[in-house]
Amino acid sequence: LVRKLARDGGLDLRQVSGSGPEGLILRADVELALATARDHRASAPAPVPVPSVAPAGERVPLRGVRGAVADKLSRSRTEIPDATCWVDADATELMAARAAMNAAGGPKISLLALLARICVHALARFPELNSTVDTAAREIVRLPDVHLGFAAQTPRGLVVPVVKDAGRRTAESLTEEFGRLTEAARQSALTPADLTGGTFTLNNYGVFGVDGSTPIINHPEAAMLGVGRIIPKPWVHQGELAVRQVVQLSLTFDHRVCDGGTAGGFLRYVADCVEQPAVLLRTV
């Protein structure tokens, strides 16, 4: 009876002092211990609820363009095991080639268009980077055409319009399409077709005065090339120290589609074309 009484009251008999012969715990001892415990609980102050404290400051909803960007970049970071490599390149000859093209008359050629041409040629040599990963099928899908995304700043945030069939376009056509899409982005007039279907992205963050960055891949693509600002720097040219126009190039790639040797080969080829564009661009 004593044990049942203690068990029903949630009392540990090891904590009770017995008043019976040789310390035997009696019913009265259990009843006294239970009454003492009830009195203690009744006299204990009620816990004071602590109000939840929200972080101070302005709260901006993640929706619209900002929300879409957040979702896509979060997915990229979650799903893609990426890595980034960098190289500095002497862009003096590329800048001179562009100046010569524009001095010859006709529509002006943008630097972004020349960089796009270089990317297209590099992807032809390293097709692993113009691909996507089908996670459900556990397959790498190498894509036959280059649809080139590029970062464009708008009043509502950064968007990535896509130049379709970039590999079939001349530098003049690329310049025109970059201009059209950039203006449409500024006017918030991009269509869903303008923003989808990319296979590789070119991010010219140098327009923001930035030297280098580690781009986040535009899911579900496999790579992104970042281009920093082109600025005068000391450079060893033909064995002599000279001031040259130098740019930092960075490539973030999905390590599932290729190893570092392939990614490094792609980036080195891009840098070589930036430094010696004459042969590559002769058909422009």
Regions found by a protein language model. Give the residues of each.
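C-terminal catalytic/motor cores of large multi-domain enzyme assemblies
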Residues: 5-12, 21-24, 28-29, 37-284
